[in-house]
Amino acid sequence: MDLRWDSDKTIEEMVNQGVRNAYLDKGNPLRASIVKNPISERINTKDNSPAVVHVSLVPGSDLDISIAAKGAGSENKAVLGMLNPSDNIVDFVLGEIPKMGAGWCPPGVLGIGIGGTADKAMIMAKESLFETIDIQELKKRGPSNKIAVSYTHLTLPTN
């Protein structure tokens, strides 16, 4: 990897400064929803820091940054299921959705990570939210693999 930047700060420190700058900007329409210490005094930081930062080092000299500006409230709907090999993934997901109840801000989008350890599955679920899926096109042409079949089974009625 041949990538350098002129700073003595860590990646996390630079990202946190960027998040603070963005959330404190007068034109920012997003709500600050991160607390300093979730266990004791739940005081809002008012700048959505500290940010959650995942770093993946790959060969080359390019830098690719994906940003999800979301509050911690979206984590309130997170579900982790450790399934047995005989369990049906689609049945599990469809069984969990009604338990989520109200309280999520539209649009409701599910990120699903399958396989690996618990922490890896949760990261995969977050990363899946960056993928583009045209569900109407998928339904029209039909699924081409097992993952696409799962997408069509997970599509919920709109009424």
Residue ranges of model-derived segments:
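Short acidic, glycine/serine/threonine-rich loops at helix termini
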Residues: 6, 78-81, 119-126
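A generic, well-ordered mixed alpha/beta core segment in the N-terminal half of proteins
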Residues: 2-61, 66-68
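Internal alpha/beta scaffold segment
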Residues: 15, 75-104
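Flexible, glycine/charged-enriched surface loops at secondary-structure junctions
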Residues: 24-37, 99-111, 135-146
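Conserved small/polar residues in nucleotide/adenosyl-binding loops
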Residues: 152-158
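Conserved phosphate/anionic-ligand binding catalytic regions in large, soluble enzymes, centered on
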Residues: 1-5, 104-120
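Active-site-proximal helix-loop elements at catalytic-domain edges
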Residues: 61-89, 147-150
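Gly/Ser/Thr-rich active-site loops/lids in small-molecule metabolic enzymes
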Residues: 14-15, 19, 86-92, 121-148
